[in-house]
Amino acid sequence: MNLAKFPRRGYVTEPTPLEALPNFSKALGADINIYIKRDDLLPGTAGGNKTRKLDFSMADAINQGADTIITCGVQSNHCRLTLAWAVKEGLDCHLVLEERVKDSYNPEASGNNFLFQLLGVKSVTVVPGGSNMLGEMEKLAEKLRAEGK
């Protein structure tokens, strides 16, 4: 597939390095060399390869005239990175988080939640584990549309 035909925002401008893992290679005992791709060095808020997909999905949203991004996850690095790029692009961002273990979500004990607030998230909605996440995001989208977003 030729990815060049899809619009991008330019978040990824340089290839990330490969780093040798000699101790891991040695531990495997075979005559092999293991390397890791250092996508943790991509720009953003330490999200690794998620920046690559957001390079395309944010371009798509902006090209469609979006002023608001809604995404979902579980104590989510994806949510954090989406929020960071949305803020950089001047878009509002709302998050829907799935609480997979009942009564486990504690915003004061979450590094990601601290960053959500620091980055200026518009809202964080926490739903029970097993929820229809697409449905939950659509409910939020309908509410925002009714408010003129």
What are these language model-derived features?
Residues 1-149:
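PLP-dependent amino-acid enzyme catalytic core
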